[in-house]
Amino acid sequence: MVDATPIRPRSAATVTKWDYEADVVVAGYGIAGVSAAIEAARAGADVLVLERTSGWGGAAALAGGFIYLGGGTPLQKACGFDDSPENMKTFMMAALGPGADEEKITDYCEGSVAHYNWLVDCGVPFKESFWGEPGWEPPFDDGLMYSGGENAAPFNEIATPAPRGHVPQMDGKRTGEKGGGYMLMKPLVETAEKLGVRAEYDMRVQTLVTDDTGRVVGIVAKQYGKDVAVRARRGVVLATGSFAYNDKMIEAHAPRLIGRPGAAIEEHDGRSILMAQALGADLAHMDATEVAFLCDPQLVVRGILVNGRGQRYVPEDTYSGRIGQMTLFHQDNQAFLVIDEASYEEGAAATTATPFLRAQPKWAAETVEELESDMGLPAGALQSTVEVYNKHAAEGSDPLLHKKSEWVKPIGSPVAALDLRGFTLGFTLGGLRTTVNSEVLHVSGEPIPGLFAAGRCTSGVCAGGYASGTSLGDGSFYGRRAGISAAKQN
């Protein structure tokens, strides 16, 4: 059990025997860890990865596989979309804040095309096809999709819409079992193995090891119940994931997720953050969280979402993660989908990757007035909402929230409502403050010697908002930087 207390380092002077040694030691074999291992090995370092579980993959291998890339990648161009680093940055600064790290986002956008090419060179496959329907991810093996609300209000007025959700090609994928994330991780691990990267499994990192100057020189881990000391001759890379499954840290830093299921894996217990904190590591955006909204987007887009007062509050055609944040943060987790019979049947028949998120209506009625009464909403509240919506929908517009005209249609009869109260879960976005070279920063602003980090144990490009693919995107991008930086150390 890990609590929220910083985990003190061990002095190298007390280590009588190093059980393992390498130039660069990487804690965690998910997307950030494997990317760090590849680049460190390519830089000539002897690399050892310590993985807590019995196999590689981490949360990345179970994910849908979105990697947020843009700026004019070959895949974007092949699918007929124009994009630029400047346009990508404009969207990310608007969508991932407030307080987004402009230096990191600029760096990420300018390096995005090269990062796509790096992934392809490592064997990650992308099919040159675009999926344009609403959804959490493509239901087939299409390689490109909108994954952050780029084509929805307000962002489609801030930056030119461009899809940036790049998905590794995989037939018969099953998110949570063997999804697109598996086809991201598999070729990267194979690349690492070809480069001579070693891996030790069932290694639960316990604490960092420092020398008398304060430099990080290793890790103590527990393997099969026994403490083992691992020496890092050049540097240690922390890549063990978020703190979504550390209840004490959630209570201390991200209380909006208290009681919400974690959209992560239970190994995400924040230990790397606590180990680095004991060395004086600075933290950033620890309250930031992504929130998933658990209703199939093919249904949501065809109705109207209302809160506990019967009022609309978000354009229904936007990114589901944005809907989740707006629902949990601003509507007390109260949400109902009001939809007529014809639209419900159309949405239920539409192709989707998430048919298991198609909830059944809880209430149905011939009129909105009856539905409102059955739902227990204030008299007239839902009626006025639907009246205003239908008035403009008859003209194909939504001047209130600016849902795109293709999804705007008057709500007819019979009409139903889905009870979506509490249909959210989330994961944390905050963590260690790092430089663009993935150096872990001390609260003084100086890098901690010998210590690097990437992935969800750090605060990456997301400071509050989110787009699907940014975790795997900046995890791999800054994982590479961590490996390069660690390998350069003397």
Describe the function of each predicted region.
Residues 1-24, 42, 461, 465:
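Extreme N-terminal leader/targeting segments of oxidoreductases
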